[in-house]
Amino acid sequence: MGGASVNIQLLDGKPCIRKSGASPVECHFYQRAALHLSGLNTPALLKVEGETLFLEQIPHPVTLTQLHRNEQTFAQLASLHNANYQPDFAVKTHGWSLADTDEALAILCLPEAANEQIRHIQQLGYELFEQSCLISGDSNEGNWGIRDNGELVLFDWERFGYGSPAIDLAPLVPQMGSLAEYEAIIERYLRHSSLLSGDRLLRHLVMAKCWLIIEVTNLLTRREKPQAQQYLEWYRQQLPR
């Protein structure tokens, strides 16, 4: 959902990902942060030309089901969240304002009962951004891939910043998720991290799932993305009434 342009091209006779218009956060991540984050697989940086990154191509996509079954999904996210590394560059600042909420709700046109529920959660949402752990900020299934050797890799780092681990777990919950699905994700994650209790993670996961609706709605409509209407219709069908 970012503003960069991505394509495959040859570099020294081998296919790579050329990402032009990469954000400063993502450029700095690959140049300065990635090497310090042990236990986390990210694409190798092959070359940099200004705001254009040439990255290792990760050839095999993964499904959400595959991510759930792969212990490395949760182990790698936990490694990131527990990292002692402190970036020496400006990272993405995440937040959830009432203005952003009202903007998204005006677009979504949900029943007033749903609007009130979302506004109530927004008032508590500051908890998501009080955490001092590093997060991807965009760990949806489309940003994972598998190398030929079977290694799981997480890419697309323009939202690299600080926040609750639940922000990275929320995209792993199918659709809007049931309580059992939330608890299953938390159980897998807690095998690798004790940063937050299960109860705290569940609370944050509900908040993060709601926050992502606001974030995605506003990003897609502000950037006039062609898939915006598809997402909006899906949200209207899925959100409680």
Model-found features: residue ranges?
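Active-site activation/catalytic loop segments of kinase-like enzymes and analogous catalytic loops
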Residues: 166-195, 209-236
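Short Pro/Gly-enriched beta-strand edge/turn motifs at strand-loop
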Residues: 26-29, 37-39, 117-129
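Regulatory N- and C-terminal appendages and interdomain linkers associated
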Residues: 25-26, 235-241
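Conserved kinase catalytic-core helix
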Residues: 61-96, 111-119, 125-127
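A glycine-centered beta->alpha junction motif in the catalytic cores
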Residues: 50-66, 101-103, 210-226
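Glycine-rich, phosphate-binding/catalytic loops in enzymes
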Residues: 71, 153, 170-173
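A conserved alpha-helical element in kinase catalytic cores
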Residues: 3, 13-54, 61-82
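Active-site acidic catalytic loop and adjacent metal/ATP-binding pocket
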Residues: 5-10, 122-167
